[in-house]
Amino acid sequence: MTAKGQMLQDPFLNALRKEHVPVSIYLVNGIKLQGQVESFDQYVVLLRNTSVTQMVYKHAISTIVPARSVNLQHENKPQAAPASTLVQVETVQQPAE
């Protein structure tokens, strides 16, 4: 798993876990699982419903759909710049020799 993948997955799954958000998990074979994220690591997600906890391998997951929106802002991390922020990049060409 790339660092970028973990930077996206971990905060999302952790917010779902902490906020006890009900989720629907669609597997690559089309099966729909429902429950709450109990725990997760690099390879699996533990999904709890009323009767059982299931271990779902991440490579089998197609989509995770939360029942409501989740807040991914963290107090410890600086907030991203607003979308309207413009960055000017200046290029300087070296004279030909």
From Swiss-Prot:
CDD domains: Hfq. One of its GO terms (cellular component) is cytosol. Keywords: RNA-binding, Stress response. It comes from the Bacteria. Pfam families: Hfq. One of its GO terms (biological process) is regulation of translation, ncRNA-mediated. Homohexamer. HAMAP family: Hfq. This is RNA-binding protein Hfq. It comes from Neisseria gonorrhoeae (strain ATCC 700825 / FA 1090). The gene is hfq.
